[in-house]
């Protein structure tokens, strides 16, 4: 990394860690530009040199929480030898981690952002490549996809290639999984369903 990138990463890390502390103390709804700047020891205006808006900063702070999921995936996939089992295990791992921190995962995958999420995720992993861990090719492709629908589709496509799912059913199956997941995640956030039952 060149000096400019190192400096950018360092300053962004101050803001991300400050936002992460606020998430732990007050939840995502407690994050404001002023609170983050004060905690990081900077002027509020400085944040806008590194982040487009508050949602961009919240996304990056939330991405730190997805690291646990990314690092847990290899354990879930240890003895998996086909695409269908991989599909099931990735969803199992994803649900386990996302239902523990539903607001974080909602902020990442269902946020209302200015740019395409893939640009933000690409930028994040370019600055913090260690956050993604070491993953099999199929899984790293899925992790780098820009939205939850495309992430799921990467797994479903592998099931189609191996003959577990008919090509004409692929999009429907993926959409059903995504919609069911989003509905359950919202119920967990609203405390309408217990995390253990989800």
Predicted region positions:
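Hydrophobic alpha-helical connector segments
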Residues: 60, 75-107
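Short hydrophobic/aromatic patch on the recognition helix
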Residues: 40-51
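Amphipathic alpha-helical packing segments from all-alpha helical-bundle domains
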Residues: 89, 114-161
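Short, hydrophobic secondary-structure boundary micro-motifs
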Residues: 32, 106-109, 168
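An amphipathic alpha-helix adjacent to DNA-recognition modules
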Residues: 12-20, 29, 50-78, 88
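Basic, helix-initiating cap at the start of DNA-binding domains
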Residues: 1-39
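Hydrophobic/aromatic-rich alpha-helical bundle segments in the mid-to-C-terminal region
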Residues: 137-142, 147-149, 157-198
């Amino acid at each position: 990394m060149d000096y400019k990138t190192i400096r950018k990463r360092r300053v962004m890390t101050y803001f991300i860690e400050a936002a992460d502390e606020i998430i732990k103390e007050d939840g995502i709804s407690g994050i404001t530009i002023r609170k983050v700047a004060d905690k990081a020891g900077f002027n509020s205006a400085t944040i806008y040199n590194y982040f487009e808006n508050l949602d961009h900063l919240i996304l990056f702070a939330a991405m730190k929480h997805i690291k646990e999921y990314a690092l847990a995936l290899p354990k879930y996939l240890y003895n998996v030898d086909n695409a269908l089992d991989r599909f099931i295990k990735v969803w199992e791992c994803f649900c386990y981690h996302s239902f523990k921190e539903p607001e974080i995962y909602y902020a990442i995958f269902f946020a209302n952002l200015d740019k395409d999420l893939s640009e933000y995720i690409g930028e994040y992993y370019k600055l913090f490549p260690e956050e993604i861990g070491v993953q099999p090719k199929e899984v790293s492709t899925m992790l780098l996809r820009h939205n939850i629908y495309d992430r799921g589709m990467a797994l479903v496509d592998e099931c189609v290639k191996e003959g577990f799912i008919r090509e004409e059913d692929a999009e429907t199956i993926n959409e059903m999984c995504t919609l069911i997941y989003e509905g359950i995640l919202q119920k967990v956030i609203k405390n309408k369903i217990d995390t253990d039952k989800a």
